């Protein structure tokens, strides 16, 4: 019968068995001889067997290879300033309202226009003058 455990790897299981009999040896195998965790475990084992064993179990669980997936960070590349607002060498198609593609067509705008009113009560832009005037210039 095959035993498949999702809570720990084989190396973790062996370290748990070693930690049950001699806790500093398990921490030594996982962290190395001059690490602060090993020295802490030796001190805890000298103070009492149970604190050393609990620390060894905790350290084996925390440093398990299965926990590495919890700390994966995904970064999304944003705008590159050198590529932003650079005029392209391609001729631009001037689309009049009659030549614009319809909503359901496959040709879509690369950069859709987003209308965000900055002031409450501002009318949407319908090629009309805005009712809100700009603030006066700053004069020192």
From Swiss-Prot:
Localization (cell): Vacuole membrane
Superkingdom assignment: Eukaryota
Residues with a covalently attached lipid (S-palmitoyl cysteine): 2-3, 5, 7-8
Keywords of this entry: Isopeptide bond, Lipoprotein, Membrane, Palmitate, Phosphoprotein, Transmembrane, Transmembrane helix, Ubl conjugation, Vacuole
Segments passing through the bilayer: 9-29, 42-62
Membrane protein topology class: Multi-pass membrane protein
Keyword Membrane: yes
Cytoplasmic-side segments: 1-8, 63-140
Region annotated Disordered, chain positions: 84-140
Composition-biased stretches (Polar residues): 85-108
Residues in compartment: Vacuolar: 30-41
One cellular component (GO) term of this entry: fungal-type vacuole lumen
PANTHER family hit by this protein: HYDROPHOBIC PROTEIN RCI2 LOW TEMPERATURE AND SALT RESPONSIVE PROTEIN LTI6 -RELATED, PROTEIN SNA4
Note: Present with 6780 molecules/cell in log phase SD medium.
Protein name: Protein SNA4
């Amino acid at each position: 019968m095959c035993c498949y455990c999702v809570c720990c790897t084989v190396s973790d299981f062996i370290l748990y068995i070693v930690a049950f009999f001699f806790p500093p040896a398990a921490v030594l195998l996982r962290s190395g001889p001059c690490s602060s965790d090993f020295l802490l475990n030796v001190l805890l084992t000298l103070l009492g067997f149970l604190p050393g064993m609990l620390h060894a179990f905790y350290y084996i669980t925390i440093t398990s290879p299965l926990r590495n997936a919890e700390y994966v960070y995904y970064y999304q590349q944003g705008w590159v300033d050198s590529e932003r607002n650079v005029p392209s060498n391609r001729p631009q198609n001037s689309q009049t309202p009659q030549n614009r593609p319809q909503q359901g067509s496959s040709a879509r705008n690369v950069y859709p226009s987003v209308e965000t009113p900055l002031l409450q009560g501002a009318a949407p832009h319908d090629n009309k003058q805005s009712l809100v005037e700009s603030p006066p210039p700053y004069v020192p």
